[in-house]
Amino acid sequence: MSLNQVYIVRTAHFLPNEPVSNDEMEEYLGLINGKPSKSRRIVLRNNGIKRRFYALTRKGKSTHTNSEMAALAVKGLFTDAAEGMKDVQLITCGTSTPDQFLPSHASMVHGWLPDSGNAEVVSPSGACCSDACT
């Protein structure tokens, strides 16, 4: 059996909505029993995170699904996503938090990428599966 050499030649990302500062977090995630978190400032000081991106409105309404965000990141790989997707032969996606269990996460991402045609899909499942090897 011969193995083909595979290289990562491009990366992309997608971040939903505007960045949310530490002071705004609870406006999106809510309070604990109607009160601000007692340990929030300590945790945030120690983890060093200054802002994050939520796929939520301030009222807690979802703005993007996990599979939609993955597909938008994939589209970011190409100047012309419709044309570039025609060359994709394999879509493999790993997540610990899929939108649902069936169909698989990779199948749902594939559904958001109609120009990828008959690309194969692989969807490893489980905790910390971003490091899964097949």
Predicted regions and their residues:
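Conserved "HGTGT" condensation-loop signature of ketosynthase/thiolase-family condensing enzymes
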Residues: M1-L90, G111-P114
